[in-house]
Design a protein with these regions (language model features):
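Bacterial N-terminal signal peptides that target proteins for export
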Residues: 2-13
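Predominantly soluble domains enriched in secretory-pathway, periplasmic, or organellar proteins
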Residues: 18, 22-329
Length: 329
C-alpha cells in the first residue's frame, strides 16, 4: 500500500456498530444497533423492514460496544466523553451513564466475568476495571505503548492481547499480575485481533497492508507464522457460530474475505462498498451485518448470493455493530 493510502486509512480508523432489541422494532425481533461515531448516537434498525426507527444519544465518539456477562446491558464506549452508556439490549432504553472511564475506545469483558478491560487509544494505556455485576472499579492502568487499538481475552481469562496501532506491535498482558508478558512486532497498522478456540493462535488485521497476520501464542514466546492475503485495509473480524470460518473486513478493498480457520486460506469474498468496518453475523452464517464507514450505511450481505441485499442509511462514521440474534461468539 502506498503512503497516501496508509495516511488515508490512519485518518479513518475511528469507527463503531451494534445490534440489539429496541424502540420501534416488532416484539420479539432483536434490532440492529449502529454506533455513529461522529454523531454521538446509536441508530436503531428494524431487521424486518431494514429501516432506522430511532436514534439514541450517547457521549462523544462512540466506537465500540460489548454485552455485559449477564446479557442485561449493552455497554457503549464513548471515547471523547470519558463515559460508558449502558443500554437495555431488548428495549433500547438507556439504563445509565458511567463517568470517569478515561478514553474508552475498545472494550472486552473477561470470560470469568470479573474484569472489564478498556483500551485507551489516545492515551497509550489499557485499563483493568473490577466488575461485580453492577459497579466498575479501576484496579490497574497498564502503559502499553503507542495507540492500543483492539483487545482480545483468552478463554481462560488469563491473558489480554492488545494491538498497538501506531507502533506495529502485539502486546500480551497477564491478567493475574496485570503486567506485560511480552510484545512482538506485527505488520503495518494492526487493528482487530481474534483468538482461536484453543487459545493457540491469534489473527491480526493489518489495516496498513493487505493481509491478516497469524501468530502462534501456544508457547512462552510468540511467533509470527503466516500472512494471509485478503485485501487492502484488512481490519475487523467476526467468526461463524461453529468457529470454522473467520470473516475479515478489508476497508480499502471494499470487500469481506472468508478464511477457513483450519487451513488458514481464503475460501470466499463478498463485495462491501463504502469502507467496511465492524461486523456481526446471523446464527446460520448466511447474513453479515457490516458498517460502511465512509458511506454512512449499514450493509446486509447475503453470503449465499454473494451480494449486498440491503443498505440502510445511518449516521456519520458508523463503526460498531451488535445483535442479540447472532452467531455464537
Amino acid at each position: 500500500m502506498n503512503s497516501l493510502i496508509c495516511k488515508w486509512v490512519r485518518s479513518a480508523l475511528l469507527c463503531g456498530i451494534a445490534v440489539v432489541a429496541s424502540v420501534g422494532v416488532h416484539a420479539g425481533t432483536p434490532p440492529v444497533f449502529v454506533l455513529n461515531s461522529l454523531d454521538a448516537d446509536i441508530s436503531v434498525i428494524n431487521p424486518e423492514t431494514w429501516t432506522e426507527t430511532a436514534r439514541i444519544p450517547t457521549g462523544k465518539e462512540p466506537h465500540h460496544m460489548y454485552l455485559t456477562p449477564d446479557e442485561k446491558s449493552l455497554v457503549v464506549a464513548n471515547a471523547l466523553a470519558d463515559t460508558l452508556t449502558f443500554v437495555d439490549p431488548r428495549t433500547a432504553q438507556v439504563q445509565r451513564t458511567v463517568r470517569g472511564i478515561v478514553d474508552p475506545y475498545h472494550l472486552r469483558f473477561s470470560p470469568d466475568m470479573k474484569w472489564l478491560v478498556v483500551a485507551a487509544n489516545r492515551l497509550n494505556h489499557v485499563d483493568f476495571y473490577r466488575w461485580d455485576g453492577q459497579n466498575l472499579t479501576l484496579a490497574q492502568r497498564v502503559a502499553t505503548g503507542k495507540t492500543p487499538s483492539h483487545l482480545w481475552v483468552d478463554s481462560q481469562s488469563r491473558t489480554v492481547y492488545s494491538t498497538m496501532q501506531d507502533s506495529d506491535e502485539l502486546v500480551a498482558i497477564d491478567i493475574a499480575t496485570q503486567k506485560i508478558k511480552w510484545r512482538i512486532k506485527t505488520g503495518a497498522m494492526p487493528a482487530d485481533v481474534y483468538g482461536s478456540s484453543d487459545d493457540k493462535q491469534l489473527f491480526v488485521g493489518l489495516t496498513g497492508s493487505d493481509s491478516v497476520e497469524v501468530f502462534d501464542v501456544s508457547g512462552t514466546e510468540p511467533r509470527s507464522v503466516q500472512r494471509i492475503k485478503t485485501g487492502a485495509g484488512a481490519h475487523a473480524f467476526r467468526a461463524t457460530g461453529d468457529g470454522k470460518h473467520l470473516f475479515v473486513s478489508n476497508r480499502v478493498a471494499n470487500t469481506i474475505s472468508k478464511i477457513d480457520m483450519h487451513t488458514r486460506q481464503v475460501v470466499d469474498a463478498y463485495p462491501a462498498p463504502g469502507g467496511p468496518d465492524c461486523m456481526d453475523v446471523s446464527p446460520d452464517g448466511r447474513w453479515i451485518y457490516v458498517t460502511a464507514r465512509w458511506a454512512r450505511k449499514l450493509l446486509v450481505i447475503d453470503t449465499q448470493e454473494r451480494k449486498v441485499a440491503h443498505k440502510v442509511s445511518v449516521g456519520k462514521s458508523p463503526h460498531g455493530v451488535w445483535t442479540l440474534q447472532h452467531a455464537a461468539r
